[in-house]
Design a protein with these regions (language model features):
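Zinc-dependent metallohydrolase catalytic domains
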Residues: 103
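Secreted peptidase-domain scaffold signal
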Residues: 112-122
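Catalytic-core environment of secreted peptidases
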Residues: 6-59
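Hydrolase catalytic cores
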Residues: 36-100
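Substrate-binding/active-site groove segments that recognize
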Residues: 30, 110-111
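Divalent metal-coordination and catalytic microenvironments
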Residues: 32, 64, 106
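Loop/turn elements at helix/coil->beta-strand transitions in domains of secreted/extracellular proteins
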Residues: 1-2, 28, 83
Length: 122
């Protein structure tokens, strides 16, 4: 299971209402953080609107995972869910002045481009 916190991309800070880790049995959660504050998208009327919340971050995370799975499929790479999550964690962006993993950002901010850069190194 992938668990994402959500953050404000303009301020580069975790949202006050975003969940924090760790779990009761000390597993590291969240795995990473995804954008979730004032994210622009299109509504049912075709208008651009800004939305915020954990559901926005979940949509971005799901979309990133779908793109990642499509790429893996096209390249004949078979990974299980745990391996995919670990590669996303490996590609997460990290601030230099912060220790990771931590209770707010997990292993960092979701960065699909950086995940692909890490895969190229293998």
């Amino acid at each position: 299971m992938v668990c994402a916190a959500y953050y404000n991309g303009k301020e580069n800070s975790i949202a006050v209402s975003s969940g924090r880790g760790y779990t009761r049995d000390n597993r590291i959660k969240p795995d990473f953080a995804a954008p979730g504050i004032n994210v622009t998208g299109i509504n049912l009327r075709g208008q651009f609107v800004a939305r915020s919340g954990s559901s926005i971050a979940v949509g971005i995370t799901s979309g990133a995972l779908a793109l990642f799975m499509e790429w893996l499929d096209r390249h004949g790479v078979n990974l299980d869910a745990s391996q995919m999550k670990n590669l996303l964690i490996l590609g997460a962006s990290r601030k230099t002045d912060m220790n990771y993993p931590n209770q707010e950002w997990g292993y960092g901010a979701l960065n699909l481009y950086r995940t692909f850069e890490q895969i190229r190194r293998f």
